[in-house]
């Protein structure tokens, strides 16, 4: 009987291989460890890469797993085809130097037919184009030759996952689903076989015969031990066994779709659509139109259901593994998935945040297998909600903008959507370039990827610091009341416009560079832009808005300014930066839609996640200052600071660099203050009363009559106007990344707080893992048994272990990870040195004992009648190697004088030795070496039977050796040469 549920299929597979003596290994994180070339875990073999290459000791030789995977290579077709997903589970069985082709093929066929219940007569297989062995095995298992297809490297040579690692030819199993599944994509009208683009044959099992290790330059090297890496997509197997049309119709994914059906009130299989029902039955022509429109809307909605179903899984599992939405890297991919799901959600009439509402229901499906989802449910829900809210603020406006840009492109007779327009949508409306590409493709336009990248690069080149020095003094000469700051207690609030400024470009009006324009503002007449006070700002205009009240924190006290939105109905202003001039808070940005006029009341909304990280780092900076003054002394004065969402930087007066122990003590002091969870109390006092509290003032800072004092228990009390946490425990953890000097008499500390600590350690240990694996591979491949003692077998935590330990133990785990990372780094350095030393010794030993070298040198001998003289010149050999070779030469030949030289990039060295018999004939190596060293411009000396020396004049090495030979001949024969 065929298994029906996804859960049953998973357990049947794992139990099958468990019975075949495979270790059942839990799924690793979606955040891959030790491979910076991979953004995500994309295959089951990723966690086993070092086992295949031999970079680590084998804990077992057989393994099986069900691995959570994330791939976005086919993102644009996800939801539109029956089999593509971004998130999926990969069933796999693995052999590390144990079984190979015969058993792997046997297991695959046996499990497929006798345990999954597939009809053997419907199974086809593919093999690599020249893999006769695999074909022979399949034939022996009863698969006829007509159901075996040979395919090339594109289809049947797999790997590696990432830029390097194990790889090899593969063999795949396909199920023949019948001619009727061929469809319009079948080029042979039903006589096709695997390799055809149609849907008749669906691949459900891939066996990779790992025989090679690919390096980062793409070169293949034979593996010392072969291996097996199989992958069987759980969702695909379920599709075939449940005999449904797509992976989205399998039981677990269909259940998620049902949640969205309930939430939207729209049926996934809707056959009657209200939008067109009024047209039906009027006449045959309209009836045909009705059918076409009905199918179009049905297909569109079905795609939307599939997209949101797939993407919620990807996002949920990623955040559960600590991968949060961000502007770059992995986080950018997650943000992109949320935004794509939000976009498709509109086709299901979702105009408000909706993805977050079903997090708990989706977790319910998977929590037994993946308990980390339940543990992180609150964080997942909150993160998705914040991301949805952020994107929805500009989505409607962005869609309107993209429509107008598409029409402009078409009206101009163009077929390519420009990179500049795409960058405008990216920078201003938050549209990922890939999403824009997908939207314009539906409108029949190509996408200018190169142009977009060029615009992105231009934007990166603008320095944030460069504009502030020359920033327009907007408020000079104006009678302006003080802006009331609301941001200490809220990230949103209402305020009225008191002043508007328009930033007009003199030479360019490209909206795609609006952020850079604002950041490059200069006084009128001295740069490319003019800023002037106006009564209104209209759509597309860059400028600045001053409110009488705002929750936006202006840059000050080291803390960067807030970003976010100002809005009133459909009037939307995107804030790129917030600054303060005199007592006025100025919001710099661009009007995305509508118009803004003086006195208008606006809703001000600060970007929450960014503000949270700023609070962590600002409060962490105060604790750091407290630690420095407590542990180093009261001479410590703050000389400057930067508080950003990503990190903190603190400059302070101190005469010498900090020792490792001092850094450790400072870090521990801050983390202990975090652990104590002090309340963060603020008071506004007169300057005199504030000084009496002992509050620390920033050196050189000017203060008014009244100041704000921030106190954190007995750990810190400072003058500060910035935003902070409510209790120190909210900071989570603190880690010092770097200590350096910004100038004489001052020191600088760069550190991270909160989630940034987790990310820092994950990145650091990933780099260490890669370094250890690469070193171990070198040791094994180049030293063999000689290198066994210097293999690094230290425990290195993976991304999940790092996050879980920090979340469980808090700040105390920071010291553990600091010590561990430093110990591993030291071990790498020491063992690298040992590796090079052993490698050199082996090379010297091989050189000294090389029969061919010995024979060649002896062949050049000069017989004086009393003794023989041999000489040779080598490259990059040290004196010890030359001495070793000399000894072996003297073993082979009696009455021998040996003169050996070597050159490297800087100098030349020379070694002279002789048999004891020749010393009795007047040869003194110590005297001969002096003759040579004079020509080499150096020094030398030694005993009668052995001497060495060298010099910088390496070009004279041949002449030096010739001189020694001549002098030796004269001594031995009594004749002048």
Swiss-Prot record:
Cited NCBIfam families: alaS
Protein name stated in the entry: Alanine--tRNA ligase
Comment text on domains: Consists of three domains; the N-terminal catalytic domain, the editing domain and the C-terminal C-Ala domain. The editing domain removes incorrectly charged amino acids, while the C-Ala domain, along with tRNA(Ala), serves as a bridge to cooperatively bring together the editing and aminoacylation centers thus stimulating deacylation of misacylated tRNAs.
Cellular compartments annotated: Cytoplasm
Chain sites annotated for binding Zn(2+): 618, 622, 720, 724
GO MF term (any one): aminoacyl-tRNA deacylase activity
Coiled coil: none
Family of this protein: Belongs to the class-II aminoacyl-tRNA synthetase family.
GO cellular component, one term: cytosol
Catalyses which reaction(s): tRNA(Ala) + L-alanine + ATP = L-alanyl-tRNA(Ala) + AMP + diphosphate
